[in-house]
A protein has these predicted regions:
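Catalytic P-loop NTPase motifs of RecA-like helicase/translocase cores
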Residues: 16-17, 40, 117-119
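PLP-dependent aminotransferase-like
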Residues: 22-82, 101
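Short glycine-rich anion-binding loops that position phosphate/pyrophosphate groups of nucleotides
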Residues: 14, 82-86, 143
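Generic structural signal for small/hydrophobic residues in well-ordered secondary structure
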Residues: 7, 31-32, 45, 78, ...
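Conserved core segment of the aminotransferase class I/II
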Residues: 133-169
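Phosphate-binding glycine-rich loop
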Residues: 1-30
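A short helix->loop->beta-strand "cap" motif at the edges of active sites that frequently abuts
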Residues: 29, 50, 105-109, 133
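Active-site phosphate-binding strand-loop segment of PLP-dependent enzymes
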Residues: 59-123
Length: 169
């Protein structure tokens, strides 16, 4: 169940990312991203002096992200995009379960960019909200509703992060 005080309205998804990074990480925190990836994550994190840990595909898999590689990293946060931007990969139920459980067990802040939900091919991508209440889900009206100029996004956050978000929003 999501309560209304867990939803923060932002200036597009970029505003949600900035608010989330400022609310959750300090200078020198380590945040992992799977490459290939939407460049704004890397750029915003670096501008805040947050260390970016890029997880690249296996040597023989140029464009397939292997989420199990996260277990080899010591990080404070993980950003996933599902479906992925730019390669369109959609994580399986087993992969999402692994990501969620790994982050929960290791106290890694999990941020799920779900802006491409609803416009994927094949089976519909699952929201990280289906796996529990320890993830931050970011979305906007830009893609699914074809409203990019409106700059209207949101973040759904775990209750324990609410005070951090309120200080900055």
């Amino acid at each position: 169940k999501i309560d209304s005080d867990q939803i923060f309205i932002t200036t597009g998804s970029s505003g949600a990312f900035l608010l989330t990074f400022l609310s959750c990480f300090d200078k020198g925190s380590r945040v992992a991203i799977f490459s290939p990836v939407y460049p704004a994550y890397r750029n915003i994190l670096k501008s805040l002096n947050i260390d970016v840990v890029e997880i690249f595909p296996d040597k023989n898999e140029i464009d397939k992200i292997n989420p199990f590689l996260i277990s080899k990293q010591k990080v404070d946060g993980l950003i996933i995009s599902n479906p992925n931007n730019p390669n369109g990969q959609t994580f399986t139920n087993n992969e999402l379960t692994f990501i969620y459980e790994h982050c929960k067990k290791n106290k890694v802040i999990l941020i799920s960019d779900e802006i491409y939900h609803g416009i994927e091919y094949g089976e519909r991508a699952k929201s990280m909200l289906n796996y529990g209440n320890n993830a931050i889900v970011i979305n906007s009206f830009s893609k699914f509703f074809c409203m990019p100029g409106w700059r209207l996004g949101w973040a759904i956050i775990p209750r324990e992060l609410k005070e951090n978000y309120l200080k900055l929003s």
